[in-house]
């Protein structure tokens, strides 16, 4: 198979949502219908019945939320699919934002009862900025939901994108009958299947005028469906794939992931319309997937995916060419040649060694501590891929060693967890104390839990009053030195040795910006 043929087979996408919209459940069902798993780990009302395949960290299984991005690959109808299931909890949005740099399209899950929520808007802003094609899945139709047309209006208004429904629900809640597939012009009726298997019984009706429809869903609902689909065709433009690929139009599907409604239709339409790997921007040029030479970048690092083996995996997105096992590649940041004897493909925590990987694929590289998020690998060209964000943390605490005998374990744990990008480490210039900065409070809990369970280290937190952390730099060396001297008590360095100003109030920050005109203050820093 040629490189171009391999490229056209790949579909790499992320599933994103506001917490509790049913994102991990939908991911499970896509894997189920794709044949990658045979029974989904039903995740209901935040209680884990069976651990969801994609929630592979112990704390995720306990709490019923996703706090790290996991990668799952499978083959379906001749296509190679990579799904990235992202954290829904807003405290872990940073991991989600970074994941969006590694995907070619996105499925946004919306709770049909709640509509568009705050986290959904923020995620859509990132998709819009990156011009990432978006499909919307309106979930939980088995519960009472907003009117479908009201939901479509809300999506257009709140997410600022034109929509086109490609499926349509028949009622919702207790009277939910199923979903009409507008794209394929057929109706598939599912029964609620608590066994959660993919072979749920279906009834197909290819003609809405057929009297069979009245028999299956009653005359009342059949009449309503005919009117609704007529209205859809009258109100919304015909589906335009090019507009979807330009991120100007969002196809919308309706269903209930937990009951298997509408998931198969979503998957089958997705593999037909979603983009294959797209060009990737670097600081110097655009990299095209069909280029002969391999390029790729690390968008995530995860320590202890298997606590028994203390392994650390760097997730590499292949952007062009062919990645080969045991072939030398340039690690651009260090300038060193490296080869990998056991690169892996993923099915959540299940990993298998691969010999080749192609654009769109995500490869796991064993990492002994050499890699950072944003690192680029090439066959010799010095490239740096752009747009992998790091956000200014909003919550801060001192981290202290709670067990003097475990100093080394704590230091190693902090070092590795910060490399993953779960939080940021600052060392105070005043007293050398370590400060952890996070986007949300739950991250402190996760760090403490993982230090205890993965590194056998104990930490305790102490409060510190910081309003904002901002990275500073200046072409005026004299003013920079003067600033650092005057603000010594508020200065720190980050893990990479960069200067950071820890402003204790918004007034102090505004005053610093006013008095030191030659200094640039950054609230985000790309890795």
Where are these regions (language model features)?
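Structural and coupling elements of P-loop NTPases
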Residues: 1-527
């Amino acid at each position: 198979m040629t490189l171009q043929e391999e490229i056209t087979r790949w579909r790499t996408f992320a599933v994103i949502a506001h917490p509790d919209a049913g994102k991990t459940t939908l991911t499970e069902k896509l894997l189920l219908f794709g044949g990658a798993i045979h029974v989904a780990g039903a995740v209901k009302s935040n209680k884990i019945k069976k651990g969801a395949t994609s929630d592979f960290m112990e704390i995720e299984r306990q709490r019923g939320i996703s706090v790290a991005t996991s990668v799952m690959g499978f083959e379906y109808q001749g296509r190679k699919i990579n799904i990235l299931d992202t954290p829904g909890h807003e405290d872990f949005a940073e991991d989600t934002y970074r994941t969006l740099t590694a995907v070619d399209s996105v499925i946004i899950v919306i709770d049909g009862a709640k509509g568009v929520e705050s986290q959904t808007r923020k995620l859509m802003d990132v998709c819009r900025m990156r011009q990432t094609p978006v499909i919307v899945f309106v979930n939980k139709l088995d519960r009472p939901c907003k009117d479908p047309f009201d939901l479509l209006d809300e999506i257009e208004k709140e997410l600022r994108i034109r929509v086109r429904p490609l499926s349509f629900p028949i009622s919702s809640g207790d009277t939910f009958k199923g979903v009409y597939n507008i794209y394929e012009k057929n109706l598939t009726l599912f029964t609620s299947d608590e066994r959660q298997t993919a072979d749920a019984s279906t009834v197909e009706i290819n003609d809405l005028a057929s009297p069979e429809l009245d028999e299956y869903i009653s005359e009342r609902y059949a009449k309503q469906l005919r009117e609704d689909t007529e209205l859809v065709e009258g109100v919304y433009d015909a589906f335009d794939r090019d507009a979807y690929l330009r991120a100007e139009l969002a196809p919308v599907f309706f269903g209930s992931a937990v009951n298997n409604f509408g998931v198969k239709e979503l998957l089958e339409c997705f593999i037909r319309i979603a983009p294959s790997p797209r060009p990737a921007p670097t600081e110097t040029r655009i990299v095209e997937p069909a280029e002969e030479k391999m390029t790729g970048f690390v968008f995530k690092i995860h320590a202890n995916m298997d606590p028994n083996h203390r392994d650390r995996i760097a997730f590499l997105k292949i952007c062009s060419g062919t990645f080969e096992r045991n072939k030398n590649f340039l690690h651009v940041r260090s300038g060193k040649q490296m080869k990998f004897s056991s690169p892996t493909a993923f099915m959540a925590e299940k990993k298998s060694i691969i010999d080749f990987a192609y654009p769109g694929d995500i490869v796991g590289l064993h990492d002994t501590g050499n890699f950072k998020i944003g690192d680029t690998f090439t066959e010799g060209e010095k490239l740096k891929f752009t747009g992998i964000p790091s956000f200014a943390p909003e919550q801060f605490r001192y981290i202290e060693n709670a067990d003097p005998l475990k100093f080394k374990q704590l230091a190693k744990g902090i070092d590795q967890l910060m490399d993953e990008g779960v939080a940021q480490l600052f060392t105070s210039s005043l007293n050398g104390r370590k400060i952890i900065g996070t986007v949300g409070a739950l991250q402190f809990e996760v760090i403490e839990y993982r230090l205890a369970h993965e590194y056998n280290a104990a930490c305790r937190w102490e409060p510190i009053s910081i309003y904002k952390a901002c990275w500073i730099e200046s072409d005026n060396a004299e003013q920079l030195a003067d600033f650092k001297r005057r603000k010594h008590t508020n200065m720190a360095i980050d893990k990479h040795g960069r200067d950071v100003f820890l402003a204790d109030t918004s007034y102090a920050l505004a005053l610093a910006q006013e008095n030191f005109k030659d200094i640039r203050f950054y609230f985000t820093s790309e890795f």
